[in-house]
Amino acid sequence: MGNEGDDMNGNDMNGSDVRTAFRTCPLCEAGCGLEITVKRGPQGETVTRIRGDMADVFSHGFICPKGSTLKQLHDDPDRVRRPLVKRNGVHEEVEWAEAWAVIADRLPEMMARHGRESVGVYLGNPSAHSLSALLYNRSMLQALGTRRRFSASTVDQMPRQVAAAYVFGTAVSVPVPDLDHTDFLVIMGANPYASNGSLCTAPDFPGRIEAIRARGGTVVVVDPRRSRTAEEADRWLPIRPGTDALLLAAMVTALAVDGLIAPGDHVAPHLQGLDEVVAALAPFTPESVAQATGLAAGEIRSLARDMAAAASGSVYGRIGTTTTGLGNEGFGTVTSWLIDVVNIVTGNLDRRGGAMFTMPVAGAPTTRGKSGTGKGFAIGRGHTVSRQLPEVMGEYPAAAMAEEITRAGDQGIKVMITVAGNPVLSTPNSLQLDEALSELEFMVSVDMYLNETTRHADVILPSPSQLQRGHYDVALLQFAIRNVANYSDPVLPLDDHQPDEWEILAKLGLIAAGLGADAEPALADEVGMRSMVQSSVNDPSSPIHGRDADEIVSALGDEPGPARMLDFMLQTGPFGAAFGANPDGASVALLRANPHGVDFGALQARLPEILRTPSGTIELNHPILMADLVRLHAAMDAAAHQPLVLVGRRHLRSNNSWMHNIEVLVKGKPRCTLHVHPDDAARLGLSDGGVARVTSRVGTVDAAVEVTDSIRPGVVSLPHGWGHGQPGTRMRVAAERAGVNSNILADHTAIDPLSGTSVLNGIPVEIVGVAVAAV
């Protein structure tokens, strides 16, 4: 609860020039609470200290190095604070009215001339960490009316969501490991000591891993790298990249042979196709996959038996399993599905200590509509022009973006809008996309930086800093290990004439709809708000079904913006106040009165109500997933004979291409180095500190070599998100530590056909030493 003398956000307002604000860190998926000291001065308010919020109900004071640098991010002199318009190849500062006028003059006209499908949109990863972007990107996209939507999802988590959608019915029906109660945790392709966790919102993930071991549990890491997480685990299995699905399939077969398939009485009545799945996996034995995976058959059997014998357990996989591939073929979706299969056959789905489902406080597709049944999931409502790649979850593969600009002829993308993204560094065959963006007729970017992507934009619209925005993790709390909620109002006020992020996105949509440069963002907000309310009062499953829509809108107040929409979502969510029906329930008012968050309890069993499949069961044998086993089996022999392959890696002080312009986070020993095992270094004539030329099918980079035994032989590692300092960018610190762009090596044709996700781990490469300085 807020202290006496605090304002509604817990700010100390006792007449001092210093106040304390609380908010959730928006820089990764952990959702840690921050305590922020703000001082008033002649030039306004400034942040003087950021530390972990000891009273936060979820993070209990934990903070990583990134969270403490929100002040440096806000104060960064390279952060764009006024709109930029490109004239004669140079970006110049202009007033907001002029920037809007340029967009209003060009965007509608080009849409009319080329058609709505001439517009492409790319939504970057930070959009998932922004309340405004999550709520108002939708209205912008609707106004644009284009199906050519791309995002970071297809270089990230899309396979995990597709697998969940086929099996459980929605793309957010992703089981998360019950970290605080599990006895046996298998971590595949993830390094939460560096990433803080992903698709598993859990502040202090490292501490929770240590707690598992402290209470007598076991932690196993399956990863070609001996990451920091692997170093802290009980067991490290250095698997060959791209073969995670083979390991999981063989675990199921080993359990079947031992008679240990036991989904449990709580799951079995709701389970479809278990016997069929087990039979289909029978060819994948520990012996048959041993050579391909690089793991002994005995190790595979032991892992399966140990998990089955544990009182509770969970397999958790992340980007190493979703962006995994063998050669030119991605297997992220089938790998994600097999994670669910292993959790199910060991009896660990939907029970304490196993893999459980969150009950999101602000609601989700898993809490709305008729429970226990639904429409299910399908892909392919549209296809790309150049390669006929199917739509997945309303978007096309990011790997197809460049060719949709350059190789689609009259049907190509002519206009691009990017929101909080840097795909020139984060998508496959990056040089191809870099060149393609230069061919656009018009480009608009909503971004805080003039970076490798936005340098191509004709207009850059700067969003306010993270400290100037209200925050609630709508997306990430759908995958939290507890049912928690935490809202924070902006810590600092907007700069003079700076619109809020929601206003920028709403106005872009209004201009696209032909309403001109003077259109008021509040109009889009009101239309969106009324649409949400009307849909809910018409929904028989809604807690406000049958209520008067005008009454509900009136109760929400007349202050436009994301807080009002969030209030509606909270009040109509599973713990909601329901506009008076449950006075003690969730609302923005409740969260403002509790600035350290509200804990609505541990995860509870949700079967069968969480299901939204057409059959009303767990469709474990979904035909699309089953059919992909044929492709997996065909690739098994080739896996054992792969050439040298490249994988990525993360670092605690960065997040993808973010945060590289903050001195305190990038100082010290260079971290954009090529990790090479000593045996490979000797064979290739590489030396520690030397330079290696790394070549894939599509590109070449020169990287500094770091010889280390923390990676298995035959595998090299290069972090992603680097390659800064290109002409036209304005990121001084990042340019001084540019590194190299590993995605130049990623093949844009290598994707997982079920999800459209790129292969970023397991890229075949050739390496030679070079006698030149690394770039």
Language model feature labels by segment:
Residues 190-191, 232-233, 283-288, 318-326, ...:
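Flexible glycine/proline-enriched surface loops and loop-helix/loop-strand junctions
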Residues 251, 270-397:
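Active-site phosphate/pyrophosphate-binding segments
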Residues 13, 490-569, 657-675, 679-775:
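Long, contiguous, secondary-structure-rich segments that constitute the structural scaffold
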Residues 1-259, 296, 391, 419, ...:
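N-terminal export/assembly segments and adjacent metallocofactor-ligating motifs
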Residues 48, 149, 262-264, 300-301, ...:
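Acidic/polar loop patches that form or flank catalytic/metal-binding clefts of enzymes
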Residues 231-239, 467-474, 483-494, 665:
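Short beta-alpha connecting loops at secondary-structure transitions
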Residues 70, 89-96, 126-130, 169-175, ...:
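Hydrophobic alpha-helical scaffolding
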Residues 134-211, 217-222, 246-249, 339-455, ...:
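Extended redox/cofactor-interaction regions of prokaryotic respiratory oxidoreductases
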